[in-house]
């Protein structure tokens, strides 16, 4: 049995937590995040810590409590420190640029690709082949990074495409004659 839910989430100074039934709102210097938790989870805010436990009558209470603890811990980290995700563009002529909240990509298509960023997410390009995404919501950052990668996934023969900075692309050997 996992014991993730047994560990409390420490709420640092400067972070405001509001519990309204199953709706939890966490506000910090990087913004405000809201999440609705499963009915099987009971959350208590005691002494600058959030504690989790199962409600009576739910068979999967501890499992749901562990999930809720992990989600709220990510929310607390997001509103205090924030999350970043780095992408690299590998390929001849592959470029990225950011204008406002739109990421412009040149990925070898006959047309440029413009990707609209959702609210709360910022992007910057330190070089033409790197994109750095920043924001408070871990799930949204990951989804935007996956959407950008999906335009041109790394292909297995030369490794060209959009990849995560820490991604290792396994390349295949070319067909022998």
Curated annotation (Swiss-Prot):
It comes from the Bacteria. GO terms for molecular function: rRNA binding; structural constituent of ribosome. InterPro entries: Ribosomal_uL6-like (IPR000702), Ribosomal_uL6-like_a/b-dom_sf (IPR036789), Ribosomal_uL6_a/b-dom (IPR020040), Ribosomal_uL6_bac-type (IPR019906), Ribosomal_uL6_CS (IPR002358). Pfam families: Ribosomal_L6. GO terms for biological process: cytoplasmic translation. The keyword Ribosomal protein applies. GO terms for cellular component: cytosolic large ribosomal subunit. This protein binds to the 23S rRNA, and is important in its secondary structure. It is located near the subunit interface in the base of the L7/L12 stalk, and near the tRNA binding site of the peptidyltransferase center. Belongs to the universal ribosomal protein uL6 family. This is Large ribosomal subunit protein uL6. It comes from Salmonella arizonae (strain ATCC BAA-731 / CDC346-86 / RSK2980). The gene is rplF.
